[in-house]
């Protein structure tokens, strides 16, 4: 039988942990937020899958040139979605108006572009924020859950108004 001392065991464990950390690499991320979707919409008057792919590819390549290895994309900014969802309307930040289909799948494109550039991608979700600076439910898409809840007295409390915003 072979015996291992506590010192040898600790050394082996530490070496294994260091090797695992080195193989995973450092976490160097940047955030692609709803402001970046606004920048895309400002740059391209014709909003197509090809234009979005071009825009996001430029963003990813810039991040890569700065040593980043991961992009965190905001996919649920204001009670809406940057992907097709049966629960949340399309985000105004991708299409210009909440509830309007942009005609392509932005999240699919972002995943493809990130992976094509050897970059990891993570989704960022704001689960509670519905609006900032407005409590006007009529500005929300008709299929926005907050608007639906507000329409019924029994569920109105599901959405809170605080500081001129909805949550």
Which residues does each predicted region cover?
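Active-site-adjacent "subsite" loops/lids of carbohydrate-active enzymes
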Residues: 22-54, 123, 128-167
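Catalytic domains of carbohydrate-active enzymes, especially glycoside hydrolases
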Residues: 54-80
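Aromatic-lined substrate-binding rim segments of carbohydrate-active enzymes
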Residues: 59, 76-126
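Short, solvent-exposed beta-strand-terminating loops
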Residues: 70-82, 128-139
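Compositionally biased, intrinsically disordered low-complexity segments enriched
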Residues: 19-20, 76
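Soluble non-cytosolic domains of exported or imported proteins
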Residues: 46-54, 66, 97, 101-105
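Short, well-ordered coil/turn segments that N-cap beta-strands
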Residues: 24-28, 67-69, 115-121
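Extracellular mucin-like PTS domains
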Residues: 2-18
